Amino acid sequence: MTAPNRPPARPVGGPPAARMMMGAGGPPEKLQDFKGSTKRLLKMLAPQRALVGLVLLFGVASVFLSVLGPRLLGHATDVIFDGVVGRMLPAGVTKAEAVEGLRRQGNGKVADLLAGMNDVIPGQGIDFDKLLRVLAWVVVVYLFAWVFGVFQGRITARVVQTAVFDLRNQVEAKLSRLPLSYFDKQARGEVLSRATNDTDNIAQTLQQTFAQLITALLTVVGVLGMMFWISPLLALIALVTIPVSFFLTTFIGKRAQPQFVAQWKTTGRLNGHIEEMFTGHSLVKVFGRQHEAEQTFREHNDQLFASSFRAQFISGMIQPAMMFISNVNYVLVAVVGALRVTSGSLSLGEVQAFIQYSRQFSQPLTQVASMANLVQSGVASAERVFALLDAPEQTPDPAPLEMPPVQGRIAFENVSFRYTPDQPLIENLSLAVEPGQTVAIVGPTGAGKTTLVNLLMRFYDVTGGRITLDGVDIATMPREQLREQIGMVLQDTWLFGGTIAENLAYGADDHDEAAIVRAAEAAHVDGFVRMLPEGYETTLDEEGSNVSAGQKQLITIARAFLAEPSILILDEATSSVDTRTEVLIQRAMNTLRTGRTSFVIAHRLSTIRDADLILVMENGSIVEQGTHEELIAAEGAYARLYSAQFAQAVAEVD
C-alpha cells in the first residue's frame, strides 16, 4: 500500500538583501523556553543514571589529581629555590643565625624572604633525591589524571550516543503517529532537517559539552579550594573574575540565542527547497525554471549565511573577552604574589603554584564561556526536535475488533469534514456502496474527491457523521486493521531503492515468489520484467528512473493486487500511462475488481463509462450519481464535465 505524497509548502520571503539585514527572513526569533528545553535535554540522560554517575566519579578523580599537580610542582620549585639560596649562604650556621646576620647587615627584606623558606639549609645545595621523588609523584599524578579522563570520555560517548539513539527512535516513532495534516503543513525538507540535522547537532552539543561542563565546574571548585588554602587574599582577587565572566557570558549569549534559532530554522527551509528541487528536477528543467530555483537557493543561502555569521561572530566574542579577564587576573596575582614572597608570607613555590592555579581557574571559565555557542545551538535544535515530539498526534487506535471476513459494503452517513474550523469542505454527505461495486468519483479540482478517499483510509477523521465498513464504524477500528483491507494506488508512484520483487511485495506480509509473479502477470508487469537482464531481481534506484512512468504505475498496481485487499482505491491510477498500457490495465482491472469494492478517481473515459456508479462532486457534495448513460441523459453537471473533458478522448478512440 502506498502513502500519499504531497508537495511541500514553499517558503516565501522578500528581497535577499533586505532579509540579510534582518538576519534570516525577518527579526531573529528567540528561544521560546531556553531553561525548559535545557532541562528536557538533560533529562534524556536520566535512563543512564549509573553511567552518568561514573562520568561524575571519574571526573572528580581526574580533576582532583589535576588540581594536585601544581601544588606538587610548587613544592619542587621550593626544593630547587631552597637549594639555590642555601648554597649562597655560609656553611656551618643555622637558618636563624643567617637571618639574624642579614638583618644586622641591613638586608631586612632578604631576611624576611629567608625566614619564610622552611627547608633551606645554609651551605647545602639542591637535594636532587628529594626533587626526583617529587617529580616522580607529579608524573604519577598526571598519568592517573589522564587515565581517569580517558575512562570519562569513553563513558561520556556511550551515554551521549545512547541518548541520541533513543531520541532518533522517538522521532521515528513520532513521525509514524503524526496525522497527515501535520505533513500537509510542513515542508518535507523541514521535517527531514529536524529528524537528521537537528538530531546530529544535539549529539555534537552533548558530546562536546556534557563531560567538559562537569570537568570545568569540578575544576573551578577544586582549584578555588587550593587557592584559598595557599592564600585567601590571592583567592579573593581571583574570585573577582567570576561575576565579571558571568555578566559578559550572559550579555553576549542573549544576543547570540536568536541568531542560532534563525540559523537552524533557515537550515530547515534550505533543506526543504533542495529536497523539493531534487525530487522535481525533471519538471524544473522541462519548464526552464533553473534560474528561479537557483535564485531561491541563493536567497535561502544568503539567509543562512547571515544568521550563521551573526551567531558565530557574536558567540565568538566570548572567548576573547574571557582571555582578557584571565590576563588581567594573571597580572594582579603575579604582582600581589611577588609582594607576598618578598614579605615572607608565601614561598616562591606557593606563588608559582598559585599562578598555575589562576590559569587553571580561568581556563574552565573560558571553556564554559566558549561552549555557550555550542549550548545555544544545541538547545535551539533541541527545541525544534521537541516541537516535533510534542506535535498533536492522531487519535489513539482502539483495540482490534473481532470481525467476520470483510464483504466491502461502505456507507457514508451524514459525513462532514473540514481541514480548518472555518473552512468546511464536505457537509452532510451520505453514500452507500455495495460489495463488489466499482464507484467512479469525478468532479473539478477541489471538489473533495481525494478527501473522500482520505476519510475512508482514516488519513483524516470525519468532523461529523460516520463512515462504516460492513456496518462497523471505522472510527472504532484500529487504522492498521482498516488499511489491511484496502489496496491503494496513487497517481504519484512511489518506489524505493530495492529490487522489483521487493517493491512488489511491499504491501504484503506473507508472500512467495509464485504470488509475486501472479500479481505481476495480472497487472501486465511480468512481460517487461522478464525482458530485463536480472528480471525480478533488477534493482531500482530511489526514483525508479530505470523503468518508464507507465511501468512504475503498473508496479504499484501489482503491489496493491498482491496485498489481496477487499477494497481498491485507484487515485487517477492510469493518468500517467500511454493508451496501450491503459487498455492492458483496464482488462486486468475488470477481472481483479470482481468481488472487490472499488473506488476510482480518474478523468479517463475508460475508467468512468464502465463503472457501476458514478459520483459527481462539487464543493464537497455529491450533486449527481448514476451510471454513465443515466448521467448523460440527465444533461446535468456530469454531462457538462463529460463534454468539456472527455468528448475529445471519445473522438480519438472512435
Mark where each language-model region is.
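Membrane-integrated ABC transporters
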Residues: 1-69, 73, 79-138, 152-156, ...
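Short intracellular "coupling" helices and adjacent cytoplasmic loop segments at the cytosolic face
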Residues: 22-29, 81-85, 161, 169-193, ...
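Alpha-helical membrane-protein architecture signal
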Residues: 34-38, 42, 53-54, 168, ...
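An intracellular "coupling" helix at the cytosolic face of ABC transporter transmembrane type-1 domains
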Residues: 47, 180-181, 197-206, 210, ...
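Transmembrane helices of ABC transporter permease
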Residues: 51-64, 208-263, 332-346, 363
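Hydrophobic alpha-helical membrane-associated segments
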Residues: 61-65, 69, 139, 143-160, ...
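Helix-loop-helix
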Residues: 226-240, 310-383, 388-389
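ABC-type nucleotide-binding domain
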Residues: 397-398, 403-654
